[in-house]
Regions:
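N-terminal flexible segment immediately upstream of the FAD-binding catalytic core
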Residues: 1-81, 98-128, 157, 180
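Aromatic/hydrophobic pocket-lining residues that form π-stacking "cages" and hydrophobic walls in ligand
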Residues: 79, 86, 141
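Short, basic and Ser/Thr-rich N-terminal targeting/leader segments
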Residues: 84-86, 93-95, 162, 186
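Residue-level detector of anion-binding/catalytic polar loops
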Residues: 88-89, 151
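Extended, hydrophobic alpha-helical segments in both membrane/secreted and soluble proteins
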Residues: 90-92, 99, 141, 171
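FAD-binding subdomain of flavoenzyme oxidoreductases
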Residues: 119-212
Length: 212
């Protein structure tokens, strides 16, 4: 005997009414994000967003509706959550040195700059590990580790300017990757946020951890 079954009609989750017109959509986004960020941490005027229209892949350019520059994780999470509620795409950006278009803005979205997350939390010479925020420059990690006779191996040609967050996103390498591997082989733990603004962590700082 077959178990009874019921066919039901499924409706898509209701999305907020977001205007299609760019100016109206921009006004809605700016209105939602302004209370979440400090003054001057939200850019939407054309002259302010032009510097963010592309990354190192300059053949493709697009102006975002706005550029958010949060300073704390709470602000970052709030921006992501607000954009998610509005159904607005978010593109994260480090230093914009990538050549694969990973930071190319979405014309109907928000560019989320991580430039202000530029703190080196600690360097542990005993375990030979460092905890840094995503906006720290690649070269700055080696500079901080140099006093302990150490350095961070993945060294893309843009290491003076590129950030570790961008390196993780692009799995950057460099001349030392033949011996020490790519970024993925040198990162033990990553803390990030989902599009809903929820914090997530992957990996562990334990030296015997499998890594990422």
């Amino acid at each position: 005997m077959n178990a009874p079954s019921t066919a039901t009609e499924l409706s898509p989750a209701r999305q907020p009414d977001v205007p299609v017109d760019r100016r109206q959509r921009q006004a809605l986004v700016v209105g939602a994000l302004t209370p979440l960020l400090p003054a001057h941490a939200l850019l939407w005027q054309r002259e302010d967003t032009v510097p963010y229209e592309c990354d190192g892949l300059t053949a493709y350019r697009e102006l975002p509706l706005a550029v958010a520059l949060p300073e704390t994780e709470a602000q970052l999470a709030a921006v992501l959550a607000a954009c998610h509620r509005l159904g607005v795409p978010v593109v994260a950006r480090g230093a914009g040195t990538g050549l694969s278009g990973g930071a190319t803005p979405h014309a109907q979205g928000v560019t989320l700059s991580l430039a202000k997350f530029n703190r080196i939390v600690r360097v542990d010479p005993v375990s030979r590990t460092a905890v840094v925020q995503s906006g720290v420059r690649n070269a700055a990690i080696s500079e901080a580790a140099a006093r302990h006779g150490l350095y961070y191996a993945p060294d893309p040609s843009s290491k003076i300017a590129c950030t570790i967050g961008g390196n993780v996103a692009e799995n950057s390498g460099g001349m030392h990757c033949l011996k020490y591997g790519l970024t993925i082989h040198n990162v033990l733990r990553v803390r990030g946020y989902t599009v809903e603004g929820e914090a997530v962590e992957f990996g562990s700082e334990a030296l015997d951890a499998a890594g990422l």
